[in-house]
Amino acid sequence: MLIQYLIKQSINPSGLVGRVITNIWSSYFKELSLWVIKQTTIPNNSRILEIGYGGGSTIKNLLSLDKNLDIYGIDISKESYQTAKRMLLKSIENDSVQLMVGNVENLPYQNHYFDLVFAIQTHIFWKDLKQSFQEIYRVMSNHSTLIIASEKEKIKYHMTDYGTSSELSQLLTSIGFSKIEERQNHKWVLYIVIKRH
């Protein structure tokens, strides 16, 4: 019962427990976030979307690169929105960051809008993986990159479908992505997914 409640909170943090979880995540996933950013080519003036921004730590790390980035974030959790908004208030006020609450299965952005999309420790919770990746594909520009990253153990625990690299690659290719590169270390796996048209 408690485990199910905590899993539900990890998918969509809410209330006091959600606030605590969101703050823990920002600290716990800092190392993963920095590793992902280090693995990623991020051109100056890129328009970036982070799906599942949690407490906002990845967006904060991206801003610290000082590359004049235009960053958007969407997260299903209102609690995550409030936490990230507090952390990123100055950047929100100067319009370099725009955050919203929403679902990856129905992204409120125009077609071909983003140069780079991050999904860190989040795709493992999506209800409809195919629909979610189709939506991401739609909002990506014709020469853009999707970065998917997660703890290996969480993939094994949460994903019954598309849990292996080959299954995920087949799904992404069927949607139209042209190249998938996998990188990993002892804890994490990262996919660099290219859209080229």
Predicted regions mapped to residue ranges:
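Conserved alpha-helix/loop element of class I SAM-dependent methyltransferases that forms part
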Residues: 27-44
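Class I SAM-dependent methyltransferase SAM/SAH-binding core
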Residues: 49-106
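A short acidic, Gly/Pro-enriched loop at the edge of an enzyme's catalytic core
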Residues: 105-117
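Core SAM-dependent methyltransferase catalytic element
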Residues: 176, 184-197
